[in-house]
Design a protein with these regions (language model features):
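Transmembrane alpha-helix interface motif
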Residues: 1-41, 47-58, 141-151, 155-158, ...
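Hydrophobic alpha-helical transmembrane segments
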Residues: 25-26, 44-46, 66-69, 73, ...
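Membrane-interface helix-boundary motifs at transmembrane edges
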Residues: 60-66
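Juxtamembrane/interface alpha-helical elements of multi-pass membrane proteins
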Residues: 69-185, 189-192
Length: 266
């Protein structure tokens, strides 16, 4: 928990850091669509190279990347386990009643785990290289055209920004609550059953603390006379630059490579 940093910005001045947040959000969406269209392990190769290239250019330390990804690996494990029982093609390797694990299910589980890990790594690069306020501003600007039809663009951007800021806070609160319960004699470690018991002793004080932080944030916004977008100005104006165009070209090349590989696999 102490190393949890997903959603936390890592300061830097790389080419990735300098990209417009709108470019990162749009290309992040294209990256997700591209990764979802991959239909085989060979298609994951250009995606993996693309992700490695992003982190190499951003110059974010490997240790920081791994620490920010570690809490998300539980999702990868759950998805992989579920896929173990979906594809029953190939030779049956293990069977217990109606539960079967075959060669096809192993391939499916490994493929889904790799694809989901790459998707998370790609999106994690956005939060590591973009301040939360810039992400909020970029998201709000992208939704601005829809404000004419009644979509609350500013409010949605604010919600996203607060959610990203609260991720590390939530993890810190959970760590502090678990330590406090342990100091009072509660068992907060020890295998899967220990994890379930920990949730029972940590959940109520954890959510109490989260609601307290939410009330404090609400009071702080009221004290600063926050009334939404009205009268709000920005220190740095968003602007597309040459680097944004280059990033778009590279992402489109990735999409083209994945399409070509998929056609070869058909």
């Amino acid at each position: 928990m102490e190393a949890f940093s997903f959603g936390s910005y890592y300061p830097g001045d790389s080419a990735i850091h300098r990209l417009d947040p709108r470019t990162k959000l749009l290309l992040g969406f294209v990256f997700l669509i591209t990764t979802l269209t991959v239909s085989g392990f060979r298609g994951l190769a250009p995606v993996a190279i693309f992700v490695v290239l992003i982190y190499a250019v951003s110059r974010v330390p490997v240790r920081r990347v791994l620490s920010s990804m570690a809490p998300l690996l539980a999702i990868v494990v759950v998805v992989a386990v579920l896929n173990l029982f979906t594809d029953q093609s190939g030779r049956i390797l293990w069977q217990l009643g109606f539960l079967r694990i075959s060669e096809g299910s192993l391939r499916s589980a490994a493929f889904m785990a790799c694809r989901l890990t790459l998707m998370m790594a790609g999106m994690n690069a956005i939060t590591l290289t973009t301040p939360t306020l810039d992400l909020t501003a970029g998201f709000e600007r992208l939704l601005a055209p829809f404000a004419r039809v009644g979509l609350p663009a500013h409010e949605l951007g604010m919600i996203m920004g607060i959610a990203l800021r609260f991720m590390p806070q939530f993890a810190t609160e959970m760590k502090q609550t678990a330590d406090a319960q342990a100091s009072r004699g509660a068992r907060v470690t020890g295998g899967p059953l220990g994890g379930v018991r920990m949730l029972g002793s940590v959940a109520i004080p954890l959510f109490t603390g989260v609601f307290r932080h939410a009330e404090t944030l609400s009071a702080a916004m009221d004290a600063r006379c926050y009334h939404g977008e009205q009268g709000r100005t920005r220190l740095h104006a968003l602007a597309f630059r040459r680097g944004d165009a280059l990033a778009a070209v590279v992402t489109m090349l990735l999409f083209a490579c994945v399409i070509v590989v998929n056609l070869q696999l058909v």
